[in-house]
């Protein structure tokens, strides 16, 4: 685990960034930035020893930040409808580029991208590799993501070369292990008796657990290079989301209904090839079914409401 470093985390209030920040804060000087519209939301981060700053990345003003961070984790992301594409590009592409310029002395910078970068493949079980075509995907729950993902990757690649700045671009698959993740939304939908909607049946994913992300982070940062290094950040197992729902149905004693709702241009599956990542980090340490059961036991008692179910692809768009 990384220790004794000065680390900046953008979008620190995000569901991936929060546990990473808290884990890193135990042995490092961690700074976290976000908009922090409600000042009270800063309290748990400050209590954990994280220095916070209210910064809107889209504004491009980083005068309130030092420039001597040893590591940068760029996890900030704005989800937006297609009519907000200009705002999304400022927040997801232009602003981060200016931040990288400000933090160009960092030893390593991790830039989070995602599966939305890939052009769809007709086989839902296709394992997307880092060399696959990019740029033509459509995501119904975040239509500005494909353009933004391509944009931030291009800016990161430019900054790596222009500033001699070691960068690793991590294409994140489905995140698992906390109550607001897509697998958790599937559990809530099953418990609420909702139909599980997806672009295809089957709709396989390669989820990665937060515990694996925490211990793999040091190796991922060590892979940062000039030119930028691109790698899928995914789990080692691939499983359809319909199977997650069936497990939740089995444990709850509920029947589960499914519906396939194809979206023009959208991928039928979200499977990542973990080969390159495994060469860097070694194999994952968690087993999906075991961790999904733990998540079920955590989520089930509080399943009276479903938050943001459309994002979890469990309600028809």
Model-derived regions, located:
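NAD(P)H-binding glycine-rich loop region in Rossmannoid oxidoreductase-like domains
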Residues: 39, 50-91
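Mid/C-terminal beta-alpha module of Rossmann-like enzyme folds, strongest
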Residues: 216-268, 273, 308
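NAD(P)-dependent short-chain dehydrogenase/reductase
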Residues: 124-125, 154-205, 210, 248
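Amphipathic terminal alpha-helices
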Residues: 288-317
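N-terminal Rossmann NAD(P)H-binding glycine-rich loop of SDR-like oxidoreductase domains
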Residues: 7-26
């Amino acid at each position: 685990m990384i220790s004794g470093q000065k680390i900046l985390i953008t979008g620190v209030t995000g569901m991936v960034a929060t546990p990473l920040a808290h884990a890193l804060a135990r042995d490092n000087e961690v700074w976290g930035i976000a908009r922090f519209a409600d000042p009270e939301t800063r309290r748990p981060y400050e209590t954990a020893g994280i220095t916070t700053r209210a910064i809107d990345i889209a504004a491009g003003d980083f005068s309130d930040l030092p420039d001597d961070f040893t590591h940068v984790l760029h996890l900030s992301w704005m989800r937006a409808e297609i009519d907000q594409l200009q705002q999304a590009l400022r927040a997801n592409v232009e602003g981060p580029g200016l931040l990288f310029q400000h933090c160009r002395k960092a030893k390593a910078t991790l830039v989070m991208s995602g599966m939305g970068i890939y052009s769809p493949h007709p086989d839902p079980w296709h394992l997307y590799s880092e060399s696959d075509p990019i740029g033509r995907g459509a995501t119904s729950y975040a239509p500005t993501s494909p353009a933004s993902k391509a944009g931030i990757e291009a800016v990161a690649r430019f900054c790596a070369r222009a500033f001699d700045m070691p960068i690793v671009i991590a294409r994140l698959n489905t995140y698992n292990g906390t109550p607001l993740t897509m697998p958790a939304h599937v559990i809530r939908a099953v418990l609420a008796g909702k139909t599980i909607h997806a672009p295809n049946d089957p709709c396989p994913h390669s989820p990665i657990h937060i515990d694996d992300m925490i211990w793999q982070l040091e190796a991922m940062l060590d892979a940062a290079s000039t030119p930028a290094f691109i790698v899928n950040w995914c789990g080692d197992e691939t499983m359809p989301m319909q199977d997650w729902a069936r497990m939740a149905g089995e444990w709850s004693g509920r029947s589960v209904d499914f519906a396939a709702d194809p979206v023009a241009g959208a991928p039928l599956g979200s499977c990542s090839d973990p080969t390159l990542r495994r060469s860097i980090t070694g194999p994952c340490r968690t087993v999906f079914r075991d961790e999904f059961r733990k998540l079920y036991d955590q989520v089930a008692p509080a399943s009276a409401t479903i938050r943001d179910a459309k994002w979890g692809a469990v309600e028809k768009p």
